[in-house]
Amino acid sequence: MPGWSCLVTGAGGFVGQRIIRMLVQEKELQEVRALDKVFRPETKEEFSKLQTKAKVTMLEGDILDAQYLRRACQGISVVIHTAAVIDVSHVLPRQTILDVNLKGTQNILEACVEASVPAFIYCSTVDVAGPNSYKKIILNGHEEEHHESTWSDAYPYSKRMAEKAVLAANGSILKNGGTLHTCALRPMYIYGERSPFLSVMILAALKNKGILNVTGKFSIANPVYVGNVAWAHILAARGLRDPKKSQNVQGQFYYISDDTPHQSYDDLNCTLSKEWGLRLDSSWSLPLPLLYWLAFLLETVSFLLRPFYNYRPPFNCHLVTLSNSKFTFSYKKAQRDLGYVPLVSWEEAKQKTSEWIGTLVEQHRETLDTKSQ
């Protein structure tokens, strides 16, 4: 493989940062362009200190700016597209989510054609496959089975339509006469250091006497460590660039999981944080069917009030289903086509994540000490 270059969108995000840190170690890599709307100062500093022979360029720009994207893609060999808005709680306007997740993906696909970028990897999500009902059990599902989300909620809908656009773009003719090859990765729920979801949950527990909120005790999930998700993207980039592997990877999607034990989301949260004295709420909780119908009732109230008042329910039907389904997938196809084997073991992932949670606990205590002085 001759010298090559890569653009990573969403490079300042949870997954994007990990991809950058791994990517700069790749052989023959000449340049990495890290694109995000805004980079935090600490991320800029971290990227500037990366030990690499490759040139690392940070670009701050909007995924909705088509002209900017075309310039960012000039001279690039591979695009890894992770930029997205993740919102399953209906916090953001629907159109904002559709603009970033769907229109933004369409924009960068068009930029790849205009700039003659031959390889495109999309960071999708298992949410594009469901779950559609907490009553339907899917354990160790795989790509040959047809699973497709039927939710109209903005996040799963936008990611599903964006993935379809990416896979449909495979085989597109580039401006220089070449061919665009694409693939999509569908990670499970991603955990690890700097997880925005874990941060919110841990800080909420610390403000609630160390009690973790119970949200998904009925689920069976196979969460995946962020380092392994990043590794899968590196292997996908290699696969699309390797003439021997590319034929099998083009136009394909892959479920990305690892060897994290299958467990409920609540059990995962407890396992990762119990060393620091955090514990699950042991009080009585609503039965799952009743919780679902309460969510439906709250969504109905929200809809009826919309002309007069913007009421956002604390939970919704999609979130209840997502958090409480038995829904797991195998990574065997990624292993077969990409050579994917988890880089980080469960024990190591658990230790690293727990240590990071410890820093959040310590920061919280320091904040309380400062306020009490």
UniProtKB/Swiss-Prot annotation:
First-listed, main subcellular location of the protein, grouped into a coarse class: endoplasmic reticulum
Sequence intervals crossing the membrane: 288-308
Membrane topology: Single-pass membrane protein
Reactions listed under catalytic activity: a 3beta-hydroxy-Delta(5)-steroid + NAD(+) = a 3-oxo-Delta(5)-steroid + NADH + H(+); pregnenolone + NAD(+) = pregn-5-ene-3,20-dione + NADH + H(+); 3beta-hydroxyandrost-5-en-17-one + NAD(+) = androst-5-ene-3,17-dione + NADH + H(+); androst-5-en-3beta,17beta-diol + NAD(+) = 17beta-hydroxy-androst-5-en-3-one + NADH + H(+)
This enzyme's EC code(s): 1.1.1.145, 1.1.1.270, 1.1.1.210, 5.3.3.1
GO MF entries: 3-beta-hydroxy-Delta5-steroid dehydrogenase (NAD+) activity; 3-beta-hydroxysteroid 3-dehydrogenase (NADP+) activity; 5-alpha-androstane-3-beta,17-beta-diol dehydrogenase (NADP+) activity; NAD binding; oxidoreductase activity, acting on the CH-OH group of donors, NAD or NADP as acceptor; steroid binding; steroid Delta-isomerase activity
Active site location: 159
Binding site residues for NADP(+): 10-15, 155, 159
One BP annotation, GO: steroid metabolic process
Source organism superkingdom: Eukaryota
Pathway linked to the protein: Steroid hormone biosynthesis; Steroid metabolism
GO cellular component, one term: mitochondrial crista
Keywords assigned by UniProt, alphabetized: Endoplasmic reticulum, Isomerase, Lipid metabolism, Membrane, Mitochondrion, Multifunctional enzyme, NAD, NADP, Oxidoreductase, Steroid metabolism, Steroidogenesis, Transmembrane, Transmembrane helix
Tissue: Adrenal glands, kidney, testes and ovaries.
Assigned protein family: Belongs to the 3-beta-HSD family.
Function according to Swiss-Prot or TrEMBL: A bifunctional enzyme responsible for the oxidation and isomerization of 3beta-hydroxy-Delta(5)-steroid precursors to 3-oxo-Delta(4)-steroids, an essential step in steroid hormone biosynthesis. Specifically catalyzes the conversion of pregnenolone to progesterone, dehydroepiandrosterone (DHEA) to 4-androstenedione, and androstenediol to testosterone. Additionally, catalyzes the interconversion between 3beta-hydroxy and 3-oxo-5alpha-androstane steroids controlling the bioavalability of the active forms.
Protein name from the UniProt record: 3 beta-hydroxysteroid dehydrogenase/Delta 5-->4-isomerase type 1
Classification lineage: Eukaryota, Metazoa, Chordata, Craniata, Vertebrata
UniProt gene name: Hsd3b1
